[in-house]
Amino acid sequence: MPTAHFQHSIRYLNVTNMLIFSIISFLLIYQTNSVVTLSRIDPAGAVDMGFVDVSYNNFTIQSPIHVPDDGTITWCVSKINCKYDYDEVVGVTAAAFDVWSMTGLVFKPTSRCDRAHIRISFKRRYHGDSDFDGEGGLLAHAFLPNQGALSGDIHMDNDETFAFSFNDADYEGDNAPTSYFWTVLHEIGHTLGLQHSSSKQAIMYGFYVKRSFNNGAVTLSTDDMNGINELYHSNEQSTHQSTRHRPHRRPSPDGSCRDERVLRIRRCRRRDRRRRRPKESGELVLCRSVRCHRVHSRRADHLRRQLHMETRSKRTALRRLSIANDDCVGFTTRFRGYIGVRMDGVHRSRHRQRSASVRRNSLPAQCNFRTKRHLSRSLTTTLCTR
């Protein structure tokens, strides 16, 4: 029979374990998934800025949603717990995404909610993350991008009475219903990476505000546009600079080539029976990128001349750089998915082609075997001859 002190110790350990478990659950929900809520009434006369990372004037941004290669962001409305007409909900939701498409982003509905980037569902009270408080108060909440498993989720309070009309007269009076359009329009901004704004004219203002539909001509405010531009369109413009003189050190591909498959041609050697020359080495780096990458011989003293870029069938742009001391030739080349290289109609002999070691298996995956063979032969001939 355990003593009273031992029983008290067991109860103390059980309470401690429950407390630790509760704290861990709280951290898993609220730290890995940054949730931002929308309230009907501003009780303190100020805007709750939520989880603020970076501030720009009135708007605040978190991080952009992961946009796939085709540039299309998919969204889905779940049928579970939806007490409204599903087709009407989807139609109004599509109208809200059309407003955000003014920023240049492309949205597409899908029926696969498990694969959609933005998922809209109806929840009530306790549902595993941030609780709702019933009718009135909190209207919805959304999870910011890149913050955990719930990133991109929009939860609408199912205890609220939402209206789907676009008529301003339907929202007059003290007991007027809540507009589903304005609510989901605000929450979509959170899933795109926008935080609350201090501007009452902005869609991302922290509290629900009755707005005019303007006969269907709903537009985003300048504050909302600035936030999207800062997240998605700030790094679109890039400049290309060409080097006419030999750099002090051998250049390497820039950051846009990090995840691309690279073709490297090495161990290029030119033999001359009349004069003994040391073994020369060169390297050609080719990657799938819109930028050009310069490669030159290690022992090249200076560039003798530089020819104009030639384009064949709009697939390949090739620039040939001749080296003064007859070392291996360097190139600037651009790859657009299919490559065919021609060097001024000059065909070299086979023993010159064999003087380079080419890794044909390391060519980009978009090239077929015929293209790989032609690319290897052409670039080997060009690289290893004068």
From Swiss-Prot:
Protein name (record): Putative matrix metalloproteinase
UniProt keyword annotation of Transferase present: no
Catalytic residues (UniProt): 187
Keywords: Glycoprotein, Hydrolase, Metal-binding, Metalloprotease, Protease, Signal, Zinc
Cofactors named for this entry: Zn(2+)
GO terms classed as biological process: collagen catabolic process; extracellular matrix organization; proteolysis
Main EC class the enzyme belongs to: hydrolase
SMART domains linked to this entry: ZnMc
Signal sequence bounds: 1-34
Region (Disordered): 235-258
